[in-house]
From Swiss-Prot:
This is Exodeoxyribonuclease 7 large subunit. It comes from the Bacteria. It comes from Syntrophotalea carbinolica (strain DSM 2380 / NBRC 103641 / GraBd1) (Pelobacter carbinolicus). It catalyses: Exonucleolytic cleavage in either 5'- to 3'- or 3'- to 5'-direction to yield nucleoside 5'-phosphates. Its EC number is 3.1.11.6. Its main location: cytoplasm. Heterooligomer composed of large and small subunits.
Length: 401
C-alpha cells in the first residue's frame, strides 16, 4: 500500500491532540462520581470521575490535595475543578484536579466559582484598591437583620469598648428571596447620605444556602462601589463569601468586626496608657532624687553647732601648728644670727684693738698707715685705740730695715 504524504506519526498526532485539548480546556468544572480511587505513598490521588455514560481518568497532586478538608472515597459525588490534559504515553485524557468539593454543595459551589472568576477578572478582589479603616470613627453603619444575633454581638462589643460611638442600623433580610437586593440598597443608602464612617455588613452563621445572599453579584458590586470602607462579617471563620473577598476588610465574626472598628481607639488608649506609665515612672524617679537631696540638706541643718565646733577645733589645731612652726623658725634664725655675730666679731678690727693693738691713720689722707716709710718727720697722724684716739706728730721714722 502507498503511504500518503499527508500521513502523520502516532506521536505527532497525539501531541497535536494534546495541544488542542490543553489549550481549550484550561479550566473546567466537572461533576461526577469518584471511582477507582487510590492514594499511593507519593501523596498524589489517582481516580476516575464518571457518570452513567462516560468516565475520565483524574489525578490530584499532593500540593493540591493537602488543602482538602475531606478524603475522597469511591462512590462519592464531587465537583472537581481543574484542567484537561492528554497523557501521550497511553494516549489517554485525564483531568488534572486542583480543587474538589463534595457534590452536596456542588451547585452552590459552581455558581460561587463562576462569579468569583468573573469578579476576579474585573479586579474587584485586588488588594491594592482596599482601603484602611478610619482610626477614630464616630458613626458605625450596620447592615444586618434587626433580630439576629449579629447586631446584639456588635452592640455588646461597641458598648464595652467604644464609648461615644454612634451606631446606625439599616435593617435588612439576610437570607431568602430579595435579601441580596435589600443589602445592596442599604449599602448604597449609607453612601448616598454619608451617614457613617465605616460599614459592617454581615450576619451570623448558617448553612451555605443561608449565607448565599452575600455571594450574590448585586451585593458584591455594592460593596465594591461603596465610598465608605466596608467590613464583611458573614457567618463563622470557616465561611468565605464573595462579599468577604470584595470588602476592604474581612472579619471572621460580627463580634470581631466590632473589635476591628474600635482597634484604632484601643491602640491609642494603650499608647496613652504607656506614655502615662512612662511619665509616672520618670516623675517618681525625679521625686525620689529630690527627696534624697532634701534629706541630705535636713541632716546637714540638723547639727550646725557641731559643724562649727568641728571647724573651730580644726582652726585651733592649725593655729597651734602655725605658732609652733613660727617659734621654731625664729629660734633657728636667732641661732644662725648669733653664730654669724660671733664670727663677725672675731674678724672685726675692734677685737684686735681690744688685744692692745692700735690703728694709725694719716691726718693728711685719712688712710691707714701700713708702712712707716710712707711717713716723714713732722707728719701728723691719728692713732685709734680700742677706746678713744689721739693725734701725734712724727718725730722720727724707723724704717725697720
Amino acid at each position: 500500500m502507498n503511504i500518503s504524504e499527508g500521513t502523520v506519526s502516532v506521536s505527532r498526532l497525539v501531541y497535536l491532540l494534546k495541544e488542542v485539548v490543553e489549550d481549550n480546556f484550561v479550566q473546567v468544572l466537572v461533576t461526577g462520581e469518584i471511582a477507582n480511587f487510590s492514594a499511593p505513598s507519593s501523596g498524589h490521588y489517582y481516580f476516575a470521575v464518571k457518570d452513567d455514560q462516560a468516565q475520565l481518568r483524574g489525578v490530584m497532586f499532593r500540593s493540591s490535595n493537602r488543602l482538602l478538608k475531606f478524603t475522597p472515597e469511591n462512590g462519592m459525588q464531587v465537583l472537581c475543578g481543574g484542567r484537561v490534559s492528554l497523557y501521550p504515553q497511553r494516549g489517554e485524557l485525564q483531568l488534572v484536579v486542583d480543587r474538589m468539593e463534595p457534590l452536596g454543595v456542588g451547585s452552590w459551589q459552581l455558581a460561587f466559582e463562576k462569579l468569583k472568576t468573573k469578579l476576579d477578572a474585573e479586579g474587584l478582589f485586588e488588594v491594592g484598591r482596599k482601603r484602611r479603616l478610619p482610626s477614630f470613627p464616630r458613626t458605625i453603619g450596620v447592615v444586618t437583620s434587626p433580630t439576629g444575633a449579629a447586631i446584639h454581638d456588635i452592640l455588646n462589643v461597641l458598648r464595652r469598648r467604644g464609648a461615644g460611638l454612634h451606631v446606625l442600623l439599616s435593617p435588612v433580610r439576610v437570607q431568602g428571596d430579595g435579601a441580596a437586593d435589600e443589602i445592596a440598597r442599604a449599602i448604597a443608602d449609607f453612601n448616598r447620605h454619608g451617614q457613617a464612617d465605616v460599614l459592617i455588613v454581615g450576619r451570623g452563621g448558617g448553612s451555605p444556602e443561608d449565607l448565599w445572599a452575600f455571594n450574590e453579584e448585586v451585593v458584591a458590586r455594592a460593596v465594591f462601589a461603596s465610598r465608605i470602607p466596608v467590613i464583611s462579617a458573614v457567618g463563622h471563620e470557616v465561611d468565605v463569601t464573595i462579599s468577604d473577598l470584595v470588602a476592604d476588610l474581612r472579619a471572621p465574626t460580627p463580634s470581631a468586626a466590632a473589635e476591628l472598628v474600635v482597634q484604632g481607639r484601643q491602640e491609642l488608649e494603650r499608647h496613652v496608657d504607656h506614655l502615662v506609665m512612662r511619665l509616672s515612672g520618670q516623675m517618681q524617679g525625679r521625686l525620689s532624687l529630690l527627696k534624697e537631696r532634701l534629706d541630705g540638706l535636713r541632716r546637714r541643718l540638723r547639727s550646725p553647732v557641731d559643724d562649727l565646733r568641728r571647724q573651730y577645733r580644726d582652726l585651733e589645731q592649725l593655729r597651734k601648728r602655725l605658732f609652733s612652726a613660727m617659734e621654731k623658725t625664729m629660734q633657728r634664725a636667732a641661732n644662725r644670727l648669733g653664730l654669724a655675730g660671733s664670727r663677725l666679731h672675731a674678724l672685726s678690727p675692734l677685737a684686735t684693738l681690744d688685744r692692745g693693738y692700735a690703728i694709725v691713720f694719716s691726718a693728711k689722707t685719712s688712710t691707714i698707715v701700713r708702712d712707716a716709710r710712707t711717713l716723714t718727720p713732722g707728719d701728723r697722724v691719728q692713732i685709734r685705740f680700742a677706746k678713744g684716739s689721739v693725734e701725734a706728730t712724727v718725730d722720727e721714722v724707723d724704717h725697720g730695715d
